[in-house]
Amino acid sequence: MSKTIAINAGSSSLKWQLYQMPEEKVLAQGIIERIGLTDSISTVKYDGKKEEHILDIPDHTEAVKRLLNDLIHFGIIGTYDEITGVGHRIVAGGEYFKESVVVDDKVVEQVEELAALAPLHNPGAAAGIRAFRKILPDITSVCVFDTSFHTTMQKHTYLYPIPQKYYTDYKVRKYGAHGTSHKYVAEEAAKMLGRPLDELKLITAHVGNGVSITANYHGQSVDTSMGFTPLAGPMMGTRSGDIDPAIIPYLIAQDPELKDAADVVNMLNKQSGLGGVSGISSDMRDIEAGLQANNPDAVLAYNIFIDRIKKFIGQYFAVLNGADALVFTAGMGENAPLMRQDVVNGLSWFGMEIDPEKNVFGYRGDISTAASKVKVLVVSTDEELCIARDVERLKQTIS
């Protein structure tokens, strides 16, 4: 029996989940937010209890110390020695990493080198890795990459139609993201359908604050909507998704507040999407409240959101030459019945039909009618469990 922590570290946050392995039992979970500020928030959930404290956490090293000390303080572990492994979610692995790896100095350097591919994610993840290696130097640390699952895409799919020297010299290509989630929910969908994954054609829709759609052919990713960075694809919570790239120099020339390409990319990443269009919120619950109030900006943002998701799903029906099931997952995918209904209603030509009695908040499983030719499933993703499993698997290779 061992205890493994799954970590998802951002630039100012550290989300974690502690497992007892191999039983895969969640012992505790939590998040430390506002790292670097004097009013950081540490939240711990365990045994049906919730503890929350506001304190000064200046950096990721102090965040990790706080996490471990909380585990001892609340009696979840006795000593640091009970932690035998830690797994880190890394958004961008580039072409360096086709699978999860045990961390060493070179791995940390490569994660930092790939920051341009995931500027909102990789720097924070690298800081989290360094913090754990400093405080728990003797345990097995593992990196699990969002991009690994998508390394099965063929060259004609992952290359952009620009001169090939930009791929050869600078590795500009589609990498995708959310791969851990897409892989997990495809496996769970196969179990729900009672069929081998290697016989299925699935379209998996990870719809959270970040949104990505993946075409899964017999268990492998053959195309996905996120690209060189997680900015590409459908409209998202704060991200624009795909836009005409000529907009970038145009905006720099027109708007004095946007001084260079970095300013525009920051706007596209953090001030766009549902939040940017609506002017209300990036949270679908707030957008739906705006729909109820007939707020025209909320209606517009919602309609763009649905339209972009439908278009990517339609593309992947063409890529796969049909599909056995459409799978919704992640925050909105699992908890926004109205969004699911409006997406599927716009794809009825493909033979999909939702059962309104099943398409309700909290339901998991098959939400399609008996007559639906393409099944529509809601599957809870569990990226943290996938990370913990990879830690256990790789520990065996070095023991």
UniProtKB/Swiss-Prot annotation:
* One GO biological process term: acetate metabolic process
Residues at the active site: D146
Q: What is its EC number?
A: 2.7.2.1
Superkingdom of the organism of origin: Bacteria
Where, in this chain's numbering, is substrate bound?
R89
In the UniProt record, does the keyword Magnesium occur?
Answer: yes
Quickly give the catalysed reaction. Answer: acetate + ATP = acetyl phosphate + ADP
What residues bind ATP, as annotated? K15, H206, V207, G208, N209, G210, D283, M284, R285, G331, M332, G333, E334, N335
Annotated binding of Mg(2+), by residue: N8, E383
Co-factor binding details:
Mg(2+). Can also accept Mn(2+).
Positions bearing the site annotation: Transition state stabilizer: H178, R239
One GO molecular-function annotation for this sequence? magnesium ion binding
Q: What keywords were assigned to this record?
A: ATP-binding, Cytoplasm, Kinase, Magnesium, Metal-binding, Nucleotide-binding, Transferase
Q: In which pathway does it act?
A: Metabolic intermediate biosynthesis; acetyl-CoA biosynthesis; acetyl-CoA from acetate: step 1/2
Pfam families named in the record: Acetate_kinase
> What's the cofactor?
Mg(2+); Mn(2+)
A Gene Ontology cellular-component term? cytoplasm
Indicate yes or no for the key word Metal-binding.
Answer: yes
Intracellular or extracellular location(s): Cytoplasm
Question: Which family does the record claim for this protein?
Answer: Belongs to the acetokinase family.
Q: How does it assemble?
A: Homodimer.
Task: Describe the function of this protein.
Answer: Catalyzes the formation of acetyl phosphate from acetate and ATP. Can also catalyze the reverse reaction.
Designated name of the protein:
Acetate kinase
Its source organism is: Streptococcus equi subsp. zooepidemicus (strain H70)
Q: Which gene encodes it?
A: ackA
